[in-house]
A protein has these predicted regions:
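A general structural signal for well-ordered secondary-structure junctions
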Residues: 30-31, 53-56, 115
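Juxtamembrane/interface motifs at transmembrane-helix termini
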Residues: 40-44, 52-53, 89-91, 121
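A short helix-loop-beta-strand connector motif used in the catalytic cores of GNAT acetyltransferases and
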Residues: 48-61, 70
Length: 168
């Protein structure tokens, strides 16, 4: 995948992205709704096996700095149905980079891959849900106390999706 937006380049990962990925995955605040912050070894393993070998995620590169500031999980869940997810470097939160990058990937899915649906899920009921709504996704279900957060507390899981005929 190679997509260019006004401020971002969405591309496949390389092993050279390790330090930028560690800045994201090694940050406890970024990872608080997922799992404990990654060690450099765990980041390297995740980058190699999931992002590069499996192609399970793409890099969101900030054009101005050439730095990987986010990763976007993007997987085919079923025929014509894709899951998207994201983690961005905390220094770049609140500036529209996640929206710009995810919107580009969703548009690519519908325009180039003939996707029928793209969905996302989160236990963050505020920030991520707000982004899902901004991306045009609609609520599909809330699973109460479905999973545990990074601190071992039960958390609700929010599922949002967008169908090809309802996209912006």
């Amino acid at each position: 995948m190679n997509i260019e937006t006004a401020r971002m380049v969405i591309r496949d990962f390389t092993i050279n992205d390790i330090n930028d990925m560690q800045d994201i995955l090694g940050d406890a605040e970024t990872m608080k709704n997922c799992e404990p912050a990654y060690t450099i070894e765990k980041t390297a393993d995740f980058l190699q096996k999931f992002c590069i070998e499996k192609g399970g995620a793409v890099a969101a590169v900030h054009k101005e700095t050439a730095k990987v500031i986010g990763y976007i999980l993007f997987n085919e869940f079923g025929e014509g149905v894709y899951e998207i997810g994201w983690f961005f470097n905390r220094a770049f939160w609140g500036q529209g980079f996640a929206y710009e990058s995810c919107k580009a990937v969703i548009d690519y899915a519908f325009d180039k891959m003939n996707a029928h649906k793209v969905f996302a899920e989160t236990i963050d009921g505020i920030k991520s849900v707000n982004l899902m709504k901004k991306l045009g996704m609609k609520p599909e279900r809330i699973q109460r106390s479905q999973t545990k957060d990074n601190f071992g507390n039960w958390a609700d899981l929010y599922l949002y999706g967008i169908l090809s005929e309802y996209r912006q």
